[in-house]
Amino acid sequence: MDKMSTDKQLLLDVKDLKVHFSIASKSAWPWSKPANLKAVDGIDARLYQGETLGVVGESGCGKSTFARAIIGLVEATDGEVVWLGQDLTKMQGVQRRETRKDIQMIFQDPLASLNPRMTVGDIIAEPLETFYPELNKEEVKSRVKEMMAKVGLLPNVINRYPHEFSGGQCQRIGIARALILNPKMIICDEPVSALDVSIQAQVVNLLKELQKELGLSLVFIAHDLSVIKHISDRVLVMYLGNAVEMGEAHAIFSEPKHPYTRALMSAVPIPDPKLERAKKIEMLEGDLPSPINPPSGCVFRTRCPKATDICAQTKPTIQGNDVHAVSCLHVTA
């Protein structure tokens, strides 16, 4: 994929990232080889300062594994995760620890991500106390209250416990914890999927406001295209561990190229009843194949209406530029 010039600083450059897991064989034979699950299989992606990269795809497509490999929660099998010119996959010890201040994460289940035995104040303060032990208690408490105010939490709840809060409030606590170290980038792993629709909008708008105020860059993972469209500057569409389409959000949503992206877009409801009735639904046949035994050639060919014999023989590569790129033998960006 060709890189186009931009005035913004390139923070994250993911190159041919692969995350494979060895799965024990269910065979009764003791000498059976373990299976190889390809959770992420050669992803390229870029994120510029102040932008949001939206990652979308069906459940099981590798979105969360991709995000966790960036931050180092799962080990990359191959490829590079270049952060400000340095490959995170090769960092260890003190050097890797220092980068953790710049890259934080918000998790999918807001309540499960919070320690039930710790107060809200202690949860938010924990990263600060870990990386800046020289701060006294009053300084820590002051910063915690300041961050609570930024995310819309009242200071008088600082001594309460997670179970006393709603899902949306718990996610605000998680956001405050991620922001307390003043990171450059936050990875949001489906942060609104466990919340009610009305609360989803509040959390997404809060993230957009904080991004504008603090100059944050976001990697935002979701399966809801309407959320991705609302928050993203760039979009990466994943299918079975592979990137099938990527580019600027306006290009992806105004003219989706890949058959999989088109099918996802056609499933999004349109508020206007006349347009909703008139639109063409592009159906996908069959289920998502197993990542342990993916189809040969193009991984999407078993569900693709455009598939031909060559699709079973040749695996397409992503072609295009930073504005719009697609991975299909029958479509060009």
Regions from the language model: what does each represent?
Residues 5-7, 24-31, 248-333:
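Charged, flexible cofactor/metal-binding loops and thiol motifs
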Residues 30-33, 88-104, 130-133, 137, ...:
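ABC ATPase NBD coupling module
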Residues 87, 138-156, 265-266:
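Conserved ABC ATPase "signature" region
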Residues 161-165, 169:
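Conserved ABC ATPase signature
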Residues 191-195, 199-276:
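P-loop NTP-binding/switch modules centered on Walker-like glycine-rich loops
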